Design a protein with these regions (language model features):
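The N-cap/first-turn positions of alpha helices
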Residues: 12-15, 39, 71, 78
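Short helix-boundary/capping micro-motifs
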Residues: 21-36
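Interdomain hinge and pocket-entrance segments immediately C-terminal to HTH DNA-binding domains
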Residues: 93-112
Length: 120
């Protein structure tokens, strides 16, 4: 039986990006071309991921890469996680460079508030 730590280690950003590429391109061959790998390497990686998670991610009865319901769930959540990772990296970079994520405006009564809001 695979431990929870092993399952977490298998769900790398690279594995999630691979799943996204396969689903987006519709085939292992097209995904492999896009990723600069050979199809057998992707097939092996997907099988390793399936074995670790103990689920089938793709229906192999057709030539196209068709996700199972478990594969679809991993794709949706994986895309969300990849977006979160990108957002974290952007926030860290902004903090490191001194870019402020908040802007505070003080508006005097001499300015029409509506005009200020229109500028935003």
């Amino acid at each position: 039986m695979t431990s929870p730590q092993d399952k977490r280690r298998a769900l790398t950003p690279e594995a999630l990006a691979m799943m996204d590429t396969i689903a987006r391109t519709g085939s292992f061959a097209a995904a492999a071309r896009e990723m600069g790998r050979v199809p057998s390497a992707l097939t092996y990686s997907v099988r390793q991921l399936e074995d670790t998670l103990d689920v089938l991610l793709f229906d192999r009865s057709s030539r196209q890469a068709v996700l199972t319901s478990a594969g679809q769930e991993l794709l949706v959540e994986g895309r969300r996680l990849l977006q979160e990772l990108d957002a974290v990296a952007n926030r860290v970079r902004r903090i490191a460079t001194g870019w402020e994520s908040e802007l505070t405006l003080a508006v005097d009564d001499a300015l029409a508030r509506r005009a200020v809001f229109d500028l935003m």
